[in-house]
Structures are given as structure tokens and as C-alpha cells.
Amino acid sequence: MRSSETFTEQARRAQITACAIEAIAELGYAQASVRKIADRAGVAMSVVLYHFGDKDSLIAAVVSECYRTLFEVMVPAVDAAQTAAGRLEAHIRAHLGYLETHPAHQVAITEIGNGFRGKGGVRLWDLPVDPDLDTDRARVELEVILGDGVDTGEFRPLNPTSIASAVRGAIGNAMFSRIVDPAFDLNGYADDLVDAFLRACAP
């Protein structure tokens, strides 16, 4: 984003980014071309390219927006917890709550993770994001929460990377379950996940 952007230009970027999230969630990453995103935004493709330069830069903006909205939900919840178990529970409940309030964002970031290949083979995790987002990510990182629990004796000796992967997989499965069955009970699922993982981590 150019530092000299006007308020109107910033608003247009935000609109295009929102339309890109919707298009990727609805059509899939491969089918969400710049032209289709432009059509959804009601602008010419040249307008999208004026604001973002190329699709890779647009995708980077989408990723940053998805992370920003996710961390807005998760950071306060995790920070409010006083124990590792509380932080783990808050992480799970907040992320599943995000699926409820921002379903398109979660589907879009998953689509990008599975399908995006930028210039030089760049993947989702290689895309540049605002340094503040990296700071927020560290505050809710599962490996950190689990490692802290092990260090303090609150959790049993465990491999934080393995348990973190299992938690992420379980949260991701909730997204697919909700797509298949819009009535899927995310709150009940959150209760079950919290119970299962706190039992799995208990000393």
C-alpha cells in the first residue's frame, strides 16, 4: 500500500479485499481470478491492478485481513486467561467462535493455504504481513501455550508441536463440518474439544 493513499483509495482497497475474500471462499482459490474479483467489486480489472499491482499482492492483502480479524477475536480471549489450560481453552473457543462469525474468511485462508503459489513458488506462510500481526500471532501460538504448560508442570511432558497440530486439525475439521452441515453445533464441538485436549494435556 502506498503511504500517500487517500481515504478514498484505502476504502477502495478494503472493498476489493473484502470481495476477494468472498470470491475465494465461494469459488475456490483457483477459480477466483482477478477479473471475477473485479466483477464482484463492481470495478474494472485495471482498478484492482492499480491498487494492488498483481494478484500476489492482492492475496497478501487478503491474508493480512484474515489474520487481522482472527487475532482481533483471539488475542483478547487468550490474554485474559491466567493459566496455560485457560489459554488453551480460550484459543480453541475463540478460533471456533471466529468460524461462526467469519466463515468466509476462514474458508478463504484455507483455500489460499492449499492452492496459492506465488512468484518463485511463494506459499501462504511466506507472504509478508504487518509486523504487528506477527506479534499478535506469537501471543496466541499453540506451541507457546503448550510449552509454557509443560515448563510450569501444568501439563504433562508432551511434544507441543504434535499437540498443536492436532488442535489445528480439529479446528479445521469444524470448518468442513459446518460447510457440509450448516446446522453443525460449533459451541458443542468447542466443549468437546476443550474437554478432550485438556484431558490429553493433564499431568
Range-by-range predicted roles:
Residues 1-11, 22:
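N-terminal intrinsically disordered/low-complexity leader segments
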